[in-house]
């Protein structure tokens, strides 16, 4: 008899697009069966707590308490979940897209004659073995075993499981039992949960809570990454790591992948490709390609037919030496992996004392035998988050300590190579000192010039100075350039270039000429630094005119000026200024405490001549040699 006196709905012959979308939502959503009300009534709960619980009744027509069904009257994802997940109907089965089913069709559905997978998990009639702790022995998990709450295959979902300790010994997801515990509304931790299969006592609530807490520690950050990130797979063209969005894999080359942008630019166009959008999807052959790609394939491949890509043919397994290089850990008596809830997520069995575990780059831990068999014979990626273990583009190889290492992408290496070296810029000249050590000032070699007071070390290092961006100033031997420099020097140093006897400025000033290439500079003893503080004009004199002031370390020039401040002229022994026709030479010595020397200017009272104090270092000498002008 039909429920509520409703008429039998019209039979549908084809699956509509809207219903197909609802089926996709049902298969991709996390829906849990909290309670079964009779043979055709089901209380469901979604993972999002704000959506609440929904009641589904199968009949003619089907009913659901969700807003989507109440508004449209069409099959919602909750009804589709019961038909596809609970009763294992194929998506294209006639009973899967009808608005209602007759009594005969419902009886066939309950008997499972349409199921394409193994029948649902039931309590075994065999006598369960009792362990020493009083609990039943956990049953082994087979390939077709499913969780009675989420209806997912246990070995495919790879989530930690618990088992019924007092009734049947069957396995259930720990997460699902935690959700069921919230629905049963147990009063205290000492209460016992009911088994969703045998309806007997399942396990104490405190045991489930401890297992749930520990099992959450097995979840890594990589599992929470978006599925459109292909972890561990770099683009062989642009070195993007990981590839995001659609990923393309060459069907002929070993581990050759391209991102969407590089694939569209016709990179590696001579071979056929397979693609996937998410890392948990299968690779599918790329059939529809642009006209440019078709033309290139026709020209390069000749009579080769792309065909459908078979994943087994293009499967690449992890090399044996890479598997052996992964860290190997032995479980000790005090290991945390012995706590309830910790287990290998491949075989879903607990860890035991003395066993060996392998640690993957994504920090997942497995039994050594389980993960070795997986990597060597099944797949080259982690079975949980699908992160690729070995890729020739980023793998460095086996380290001497047995640890596995990975290289950074070539893009990162290129960025490191492009880092600028430290530079010391001398204002106004365009000379740039490039070197690995900071604070080393150059000493320009002297040609045909006289040396007065210099402190040099024969073991001083040599460095190269490059000419960089001289702008309008060009150092050569032309007379025009000498005149230009002479004019600029006369403007900057009108006092020092005057003839003391005549009081006139010479018509020409001869400046040193510097070669443009391979200028060898003698540095200080190690790394002297100079701060020309509070005296900008003095730095301009040194840079533009290549002039250096010689301060006598035995008796400073300032003391001599103070002694003869009433005299009208200075002795030539006290100050010897010379313009050198060769190249000016700058030599500095290092302070004992590696501090920076300072050149300070002390101005006298007008109209007296300004006094120039000695350099504030113990054994440093700064020389300015000018030749051709009599003071």
From Swiss-Prot:
Reaction equation(s) it catalyzes: S-ubiquitinyl-[E2 ubiquitin-conjugating enzyme]-L-cysteine + [acceptor protein]-L-lysine = [E2 ubiquitin-conjugating enzyme]-L-cysteine + N(6)-ubiquitinyl-[acceptor protein]-L-lysine
Keywords from UniProt, A to Z, are: Apoptosis, Metal-binding, Repeat, Transferase, Ubl conjugation, Ubl conjugation pathway, Zinc, Zinc-finger
Q: Does the keyword Lyase apply?
A: no
Residue span of region Disordered: 589-614
Residues given in the record as Zn(2+) 2 binding sites: 250, 253, 268, 271
Basic residues: which segments have biased composition? 599-608
Q: What happens when the gene is disrupted?
A: Male mutants fecundity is normal.
Outline the segment boundaries, as ranges, of region: UBE2D1-binding. Answer: 139-348
Where expressed (tissue)? Answer: Expressed only in testis.
Query: Where do the ZnF regions (ZZ-type) fall?
Result: 230-281
What EC number(s) does this enzyme carry? 2.3.2.27
Zinc finger spans (RING-type) are: 147-199, 344-386
Q: How would you describe the post-translational modification of this protein?
A: Polyubiquitinated. Polyubiquitination is followed by degradation via the proteasome.
- The residues the record assigns to binding Zn(2+) 1 are 235, 238, 259, 262
Q: Where are the zinc fingers (SWIM-type)?
A: 54-87
Q: What broad class of enzyme is this? A: transferase
UniProt-recorded Gene Ontology molecular function terms: ubiquitin protein ligase activity; ubiquitin-protein transferase activity; zinc ion binding
Give one Pfam family, short name only: zf-RING_2
What is known to happen upon mutating residue 66 to S? Abrogates ubiquitination activity and the ability to promote DR4- and Fas-induced apoptosis
Q: Can you supply a Gene Ontology BP term from the record?
A: positive regulation of extrinsic apoptotic signaling pathway via death domain receptors
Explain what the record says happens when changing residue 168 to S: Abrogates ubiquitination activity
Domain comment quoted from the record:
The SWIM-type zinc finger is required for ubiquitination activity.
Relate the protein's function as given in its record: E3 ubiquitin-protein ligase involved in the regulation of Fas-, DR3- and DR4-mediated apoptosis. Functions in conjunction with the UBE2D1, UBE2D3 and UBE2E1 E2 ubiquitin-conjugating enzymes.
Q: How does it assemble?
A: Dimer. Interacts with UBE2D1.
Name it: E3 ubiquitin-protein ligase Zswim2
According to its UniProt entry, this protein's organism is Mus musculus
Question: Which taxonomic lineage does the organism of this UniProt entry have?
Answer: Eukaryota, Metazoa, Chordata, Craniata, Vertebrata
* The gene coding this protein: Zswim2
